[in-house]
């Protein structure tokens, strides 16, 4: 066990032994100890006050006092008072620091703090942080605050169980707070409020003081509006936190510039939020992702995927965002959504696929094409299942087709066209598009199914086609009522 010596105190300690000795029995937490009260009274004002003998006619040669200190820490302080030496290790340092603060023994206070800072450990960072706030120990507070913000996800439960409003605010307002996105902070504050049963006023103050609303998803904004019971959220112009700040995005940067960075990315959308996933950046495939809200014209952070991806496909289902296939791992699948700490790897596809057509009906994910120009297989993943299964084969190969659910049917369109009916578990042929296409898109406008874009034999197809539900055929759409 390391020994620390106060050399100045040691020089003066001999003089204390020449004074009259008074024995005192101290009843502490966990045991008793007999001390020379004369020496202890010289150690600090705390002991001078608490060991003062009551003046009575019949003085007891041995007095008794009760102190709210644990016996082990008190013993260390008593030994220091006799010898000028204190024994400190990782097992006793926190309790000894608290006891030395209560007893105003400055040498032990600063020795304990220096020991903690040199040999800092996660297991006592929460208690040290709270002592830093309670007793105004600035160097201990700064060090523990930095550690907690960087290891926030690991310490989340301990923070919820122990922190009050002030302790929480100092952490959550930090630029260094290590969170995957701002929705995570909103979810955490709600969780803290529910578990600790804090006053509603504390919750409202935290939300207003620490949340960076300009980086919230619609889901996060909805939660904040629910908490504040308002229709319009407060404006915030703070910079993004360092943990979700993109190194390749300069601030400020408009949405068009951000979209240009995500070259050859996968895209999908949920409501007004478009998700840009993977692609080609700096001459390599990357694992970055970002969300763009085209209504509020702001970007929303997304943590990096577990795998880099090019020519993947994305689909929202089960309140999550799924990314399927693509290079360099064409069978891999992962999922995430706002507020999640990280992407989660999902069961692998049965066949490798690039740019497959994907769609979801009743939270069942269907994957078609993307394997080869002759492949007609389909796969599906049921909610909460851990394995993909083959579904009914399509009539045509759909190597570069697209898919969309319209009118409770899953349409699969490219050079050929057909739709899937979940209730009958069958595919039905419909007329091929007037202009066959590779990599087109299906969209719904005014309750009409439109086929747009795509290439055929190296040429871009600029003609838009609209589906006729009565004749199972396609017509040229000119933007007028049809």
Curated annotation (Swiss-Prot):
Statement: the UniProt record of this protein carries the keyword Repeat: yes
SMART domains recorded: BACK, Kelch
Record's keyword terms, sorted: Kelch repeat, Repeat
Residue stretches making up the BTB domain: 20-90
SUPFAM superfamilies membership: Kelch motif, POZ domain
Description of what induces expression: Expressed in the early phase of the viral replicative cycle.
Domain BACK as annotated: residue spans: 125-222
Top-rank taxon, per record: Viruses
Annotated Kelch repeat ranges: 273-319, 320-363, 365-408, 410-447, 448-482
InterPro entries: BACK, BTB/POZ_dom, Kelch-typ_b-propeller, Kelch_1, SKP1/BTB/POZ_sf
Family indicated by similarity: Belongs to the orthopoxvirus OPG047 family.
Summary of the function given for this chain in its UniProt record: Might have a role in the suppression of host immune response.
PANTHER family for this protein: KELCH PROTEIN, RING FINGER DOMAIN AND KELCH REPEAT-CONTAINING PROTEIN DDB_G0271372
Name of the featured protein: Immune evasion protein OPG047
Source species taxonomy: Viruses, Varidnaviria, Bamfordvirae, Nucleocytoviricota, Pokkesviricetes
């Amino acid at each position: 066990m390391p020994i620390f010596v106060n050399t100045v105190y040691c020089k003066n300690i001999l003089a204390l032994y020449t004074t009259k000795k008074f024995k005192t029995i101290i009843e502490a937490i966990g045991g008793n100890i007999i001390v020379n009260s004369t020496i202890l009274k010289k150690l600090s004002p705390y002991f001078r006050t608490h060991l003062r003998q009551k003046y009575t006619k019949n003085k007891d040669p041995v007095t008794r006092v009760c102190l709210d200190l644990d016996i082990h820490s008190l013993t260390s302080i008593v030994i220091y008072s006799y010898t000028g030496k204190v024994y400190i290790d990782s097992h006793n340092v926190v309790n000894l620091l608290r006891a030395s603060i209560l007893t105003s023994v400055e040498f032990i206070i600063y020795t304990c703090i220096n020991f903690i800072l040199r040999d800092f450990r996660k297991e006592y960072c929460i208690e040290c942080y709270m002592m830093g706030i309670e007793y105004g120990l600035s160097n201990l507070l700064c060090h523990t605050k930095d550690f907690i913000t960087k290891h926030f996800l690991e310490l989340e439960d301990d923070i919820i169980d122990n922190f009050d409003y002030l302790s929480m605010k100092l952490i959550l307002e930090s630029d260094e707070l290590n969170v995957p996105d701002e929705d995570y902070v909103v979810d955490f504050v709600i969780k803290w409020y529910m578990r600790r049963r804090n006053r509603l006023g504390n919750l409202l103050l935290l939300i207003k003081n620490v949340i960076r609303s300009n980086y919230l998803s619609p889901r996060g904004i909805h939660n904040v509006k629910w908490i504040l019971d308002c229709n319009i959220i407060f404006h915030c112009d703070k910079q993004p936190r360092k943990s979700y700040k993109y190194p390749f995005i300069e601030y400020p940067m408009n949405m068009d510039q951000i979209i240009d960075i995500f070259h050859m990315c996968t895209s999908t959308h949920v409501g007004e939020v478009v998700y840009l996933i993977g692609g080609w950046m700096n001459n390599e495939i990357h694992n970055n992702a970002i969300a763009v809200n085209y209504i509020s014209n702001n970007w929303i952070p997304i943590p990096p995927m577990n795998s880099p991806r090019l020519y993947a496909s994305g689909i929202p289902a089960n309140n999550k965002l799924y990314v399927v296939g693509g290079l360099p791992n064409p069978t891999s699948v992962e999922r995430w959504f706002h507020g999640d700490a990280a992407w989660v790897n999902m069961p692998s596809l049965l066949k490798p696929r690039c740019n497959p057509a994907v769609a979801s009906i009743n939270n069942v994910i269907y994957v078609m094409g993307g394997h080869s120009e002759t492949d007609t297989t389909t796969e599906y993943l049921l909610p909460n299942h851990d394995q993909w299964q083959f579904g009914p084969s399509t009539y045509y190969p759909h190597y570069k087709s697209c898919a969309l659910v319209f009118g409770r049917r899953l349409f699969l369109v490219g050079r050929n066209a057909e739709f899937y009916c979940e209730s009958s578990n069958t595919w039905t042929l419909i007329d091929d598009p007037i202009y066959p296409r590779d990599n087109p898109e299906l969209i719904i406008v005014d309750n009409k199914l439109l086929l747009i874009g795509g290439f055929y034999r190296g040429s871009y197809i600029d003609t838009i086609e609209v589906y006729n539900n009565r004749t199972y055929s396609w017509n040229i759409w000119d933007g007028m009522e049809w």
